[in-house]
């Protein structure tokens, strides 16, 4: 069993920068020992240890559970007794922990519940429910927090019978004690209105009760809650207007009190009921509209109220979507009141916003551009305004234009003093001008009552070039206007703007140069149309500015090189670099060695403490772009300059970088005639089991292993470890696709004389998986694999491959799985490979015809049905939109594919077009085979086909 003192020592060292890596490695070595998880829990529970050590333990435990609780098939990885003891101890432990530790253990419990609840954790519900009481609110808070950490999993899930059964199971146990506790807490708040300590814990409990109320109702409104809607919503209505000075700190302006959090959660719940359950909630909606109005018109603009304002506005937005409630607002008087009392106060720039701009510029940008963990007032107001405008564009536009004219007049009267009025003017014009949603591709439709290009010329362009701008935020507003309406400006206008934006990369103003970088990147990603992969900007368009753009962008990053965290803080700069590289393509090859050296320097600095997954991603994308556009004869030089750093990444086990490094090395090997000498030493370590344990590694290491096999399979003198990797992948539902990808390379690229001793075992593994735990995807990939083998190794080989396991087994597999699955394959490349491989069995398979003649007619039915299908589903384009990478927010949670060096799918039949070429090939092949048979084949087979397929065959053969 792991020693508690040793584990505590390593955890204490893990929070010190100089010892963090070593201690992490030591803990990883210990985690394989029996009882390690329990030891971690005991460390977390030890009140005599420093809180920092316990928190480090809670974080490590959370990640340990994510890594080690179950495999990809849901089987426990820990010993059974460890599993049971952890589940027994973790609930009472979490209940007793302080808030910051509860959060981490709550996530661990949620992970455990994902795999084990309810079937493998049947005692959980009764254990939780039995701990609830009317008097011990501290315990109640802990119990409810545990429950919420489990039940919040339901919120994003798709409806299913299994999910509803789980929810019903919980409701049957929880609803009665839950509602009783809600009423008790309400009563005790009233009874303790002058007792600050009691009020604080009671409101803590009330907050979690509201979150659970949402959990219980997130999928559908249960009958119990429908029956008790007056009770529950009556209590919540009461607390939206509740005030008590004991719950507020007048000196606190930034952080929301528990009372504000309670009101915000109520508004979130009320929005759910308005959106989803208006049929039962309708009679109460007007009461909540009134109280929300009172709230919004009475609370101050202090940041601590931002979350409440945002949630309240989101509720009003949901109300506005319902026509009968919109009519409350659909008149000039009401709309003026909304404008003056709600929208304008909440979109006007505050001193706190200006301070954020100056003191924490990257956070200002994230809030402005993306929103943040707590939604901004401006974002919520914009959503509300957009909904009002969609319902009555003329009324809303005219009312706001009248107010906006006044803002312009105030600004012009004293620009240096009244610059915020111009900021407000630009913000409101932008919000009014946009129709529909802003997608990653930008604005696609604008308000016909407004002219965005004319506004740009008159109001925006001067602020781009003026040397006497009243406040730098107006410069940012001007740049952001280009960013927002880039699709409405012509290419000629954008080309004129590019040098201006480029000059902003030389300023010291953080937000200015960052927005300039963002806007340059977005301009370079404008496509010729929404469905086109082609960009409007090409390398010729930026040839005169590419070098200076890259130089300035890289300089902005490296000026923070003293700190790995600060260096990697601003992913927008690196993303812009990547886009410039992608656009310039091969036009700056002489710069590649110098650029690569700078990126390697950045990687080396980041490696000390990887902190920003997006910055990391775009850094490696940029390296990939350079390699992709490098002439093949120059690759070895660049590889030699990278490999020392990459080998350090491996030796120091920098897991945040490893999947990227594997992809880059794989690309280099794919492009090389021989495996570079600096890469050869990786071949054997690549086969080590620990390399394949981290889920995020698997696609990349599979690609690298395939590239070794493709370029020089003799680098693996012993095939057993390679086949062991295949066995591991093919057994997994999560990685079966990678297993088939690897097997294709093994079967087609390794000399058959070397492979022959293992052929039968490969077939056994495939068939065992088919028998024991097949999935729809597995059977489809097996069908494609059969097609590939038939095409490349021959129909006779395929039959012997299966029948060597058991004579006659081929008939069962072919008839029950392959030909029934073929018509269901949607991916066009897979369909082509499988269809032509199956056809090959008929027209080139003498052994097939002699041994399995009864399969011919059913095989032909499958071929005709597939070849006649009009489906063109799911063939991926050659490009991947970079905006799809926005989800990258954490390291190691999933594989992050590098777009710049993406692997092309293997096509064994490139001469046959995946669309019309397949039908044409099938028709020609059948006609040719029929002619060789003396016109007997089709005459013989036609009566054996279904009537529908007889018609389809005739149409196919004549080219219809």
UniProtKB/Swiss-Prot annotation:
- The yes or no answer to whether the keyword Nucleus is present is yes
Question: Can you provide one Gene Ontology molecular function annotated for this UniProt record?
Answer: nuclear export signal receptor activity
Alphabetized SUPFAM superfamilies for the sequence = ARM repeat
Which terms are listed as keywords in the entry? Cell cycle, Cell division, Cytoplasm, Mitosis, Nucleus, Protein transport, Repeat, Transport
Tell me the protein's name: Importin alpha re-exporter
* Comment field (misc): Present with 23500 molecules/cell in log phase SD medium.
Q: What task does this protein carry out?
A: Export receptor for importin alpha (SRP1). Mediates importin-alpha re-export from the nucleus to the cytoplasm after import substrates have been released into the nucleoplasm.
| Signal sequence annotation | none
Which residues span the membrane? none
Cellular localisation? Cytoplasm; Nucleus
- Coarse class of the primary localization is cytoplasm
> HEAT repeats located where?
1-33, 34-73, 74-120, 121-157, 158-220, 221-278, 279-323, 324-392, 393-445, 446-489, 490-528, 529-586, 587-630, 631-674, 675-716, 717-751, 752-794, 795-826, 827-928, 929-960
The Importin N-terminal domain covers which part of the protein? 23-96
Identify the taxonomic lineage of the organism of origin: Eukaryota, Fungi, Dikarya, Ascomycota, Saccharomycotina
GO CC annotation, single: protein-containing complex
Q: Which organism is it from?
A: Saccharomyces cerevisiae (strain ATCC 204508 / S288c)
Per the Swiss-Prot or TrEMBL record, what residue ranges does the short sequence motif Nuclear localization signal cover?
Answer: 366-381
UniProt family annotation = Belongs to the XPO2/CSE1 family.
């Amino acid at each position: 069993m792991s020693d508690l003192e040793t584990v505590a020592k390593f955890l204490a060292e893990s929070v010190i920068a100089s010892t963090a890596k070593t201690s992490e490695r030591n803990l990883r070595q210990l985690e394989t020992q029996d009882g390690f998880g329990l030891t971690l829990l005991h460390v977390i529970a030890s009140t005599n240890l420093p809180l920092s050590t316990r928190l480090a333990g809670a974080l490590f435990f959370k990640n340990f559970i994510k890594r080690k609780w179950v495999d990809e098939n849901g089987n426990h990885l820990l010993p059974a007794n460890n599993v049971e003891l952890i589940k027994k101890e973790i609930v009472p432990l979490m209940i007793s922990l302080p808030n910051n530790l509860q959060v981490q253990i709550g996530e661990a419990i949620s992970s455990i519940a994902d795999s084990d609840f309810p079937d493998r954790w049947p005692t959980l519900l009764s254990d939780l429910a039995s701990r609830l009481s009317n008097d011990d609110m501290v315990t109640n808070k802990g119990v409810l927090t545990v429950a919420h950490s489990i039940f919040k999993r339901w919120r994003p899930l798709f409806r299913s019978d299994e999910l509803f059964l789980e929810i019903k199971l919980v409701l049957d146990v929880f609803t009665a004690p839950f509602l009783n506790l809600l009423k008790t807490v309400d009563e005790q708040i009233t009874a303790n209105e002058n007792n600050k300590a009691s009020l604080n814990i009671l409101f803590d409990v009330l907050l979690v009760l509201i979150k659970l109320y949402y959990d219980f109702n997130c999928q559908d409104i249960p009958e119990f809650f429908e029956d008790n809607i007056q009770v529950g919503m009556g209590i919540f209505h009461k607390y939206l207007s509740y005030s008590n000075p004991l719950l507020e700190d007048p000196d606190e302006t930034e952080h929301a009190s528990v009372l504000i959090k309670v009101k915000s959660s109520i508004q979130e719940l009320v929005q759910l009921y308005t959106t989803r359950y208006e049929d039962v909630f309708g009679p109460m909606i007007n009461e909540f509209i009134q109280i929300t109005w009172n709230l919004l018109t009475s609370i101050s603009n202090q940041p601590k109220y931002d979350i409440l304002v945002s949630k309240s506005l989101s509720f009003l937005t949901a109300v506005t979507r319902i026509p009968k409630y919109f009519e409350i607002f659909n008149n000039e008087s009401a709309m003026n009141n909304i404008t003056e009392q709600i929208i304008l106060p909440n979109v006007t720039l505050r001193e706190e916003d200006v301070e954020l701009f100056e003191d924490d510029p990257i956070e200002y940008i994230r809030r402005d551009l993306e929103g943040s963990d707590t939604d901004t007032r401006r974002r919520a107001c914009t959503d509300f305004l957009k909904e009002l405008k969609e319902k009555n564009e003329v009324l809303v536009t005219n009312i706001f234009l009248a107010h906006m004219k006044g803002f312009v007049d105030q600004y012009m009267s004293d620009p240096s003093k009244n610059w915020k009025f111009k900021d407000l003017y630009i913000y409101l014009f932008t919000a009014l001008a946009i129709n529909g949603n802003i997608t990653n591709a930008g604005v696609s439709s604008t308000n016909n009552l407004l002219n965005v290009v004319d506004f740009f010329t008159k109001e925006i362009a001067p602020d781009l070039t003026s040397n006497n701008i009243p406040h730098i935020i107006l410069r940012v507003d001007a740049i952001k206007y280009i960013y927002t309406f880039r699709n409405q400006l012509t290419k000629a206008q954008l080309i004129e703007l590019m040098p201006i934006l480029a000059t902003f990369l030389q300023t010291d103003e953080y937000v200015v140069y960052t927005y300039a970088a963002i806007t340059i990147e977005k301009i370079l990603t404008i496509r010729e149309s929404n469905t086109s992969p082609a960009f409007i900007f090409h390398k010729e368009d930026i040839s005169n500015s590419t070098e200076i753009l890259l130089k300035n962008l890289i300089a902005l990053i490296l000026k923070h090189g003293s700190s790995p965290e600060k260096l990697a803080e601003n992913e927008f700069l690196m993303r812009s670099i990547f886009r410039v590289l992608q656009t310039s393509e091969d036009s700056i090859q002489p710069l590649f060695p110098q650029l690569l050296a700078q990126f390697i320097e950045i990687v080396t600095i980041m490696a000390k403490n990887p902190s920003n997954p997006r910055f990391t991603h775009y850094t490696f994308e940029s390296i990939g772009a350079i390699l992709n556009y490098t002439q093949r004869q120059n690759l070895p030089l660049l590889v030699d300059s990278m490999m020392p750093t990459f080998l350090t990444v491996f030796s120091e086990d920098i897991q945040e970088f490893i999947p990227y490094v594997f992809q880059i090395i794989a690309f280099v090997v794919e492009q090389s005639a021989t495996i570079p000498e600096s890469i050869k030493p990786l071949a054997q370590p690549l086969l080590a089991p620990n390399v394949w344990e981290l889920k995020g590694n698997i696609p990349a290491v599979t690609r690298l292993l395939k590239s070794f096999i493709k370029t020089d399979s003799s680098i693996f003198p012993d095939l057993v470890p390679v086949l062991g990797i295949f066995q591991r992948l093919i057994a997994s539902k999560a990685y079966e696709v990678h297993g088939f990808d690897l097997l294709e390379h093994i079967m087609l690229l390794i000399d058959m004389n070397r492979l022959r001793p293992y052929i039968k075992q490969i077939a056994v593994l495939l068939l065992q998986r088919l028998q024991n735990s097949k999935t729809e995807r597995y059977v489809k990939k097996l069908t494609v694999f059969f097609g590939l083998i038939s095409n490349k190794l021959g129909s006779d080989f395929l039959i012997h491959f299966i029948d060597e396991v058991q004579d006659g087994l081929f008939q069962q597999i072919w008839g029950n799985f392959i030909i029934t699955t073929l018509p269901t394959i949607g991916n066009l490349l897979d369909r082509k490979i499988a269809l032509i491989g199956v056809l090959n069995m008929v027209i080139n398979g003498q052994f097939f015809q002699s041994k399995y003649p009864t399969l011919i007619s059913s095989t032909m039915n499958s071929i005709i049905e597939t070849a006649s299908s009009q489906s063109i589903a799911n063939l991926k384009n050659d490009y991947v939109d970079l905006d799809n990478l926005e989800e990258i927010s954490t390291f190691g949670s999933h594989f992050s594919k590098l777009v710049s060096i993406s692997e092309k799918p293997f096509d064994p039949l490139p001469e046959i077009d995946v669309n019309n070429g397949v039908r044409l090939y099938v028709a020609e092949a059948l006609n040719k085979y029929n002619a060789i048979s003396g016109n007997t084949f089709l005459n013989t087979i036609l009566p054996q086909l279904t009537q529908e397929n007889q018609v389809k065959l005739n149409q196919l053969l004549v080219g219809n």
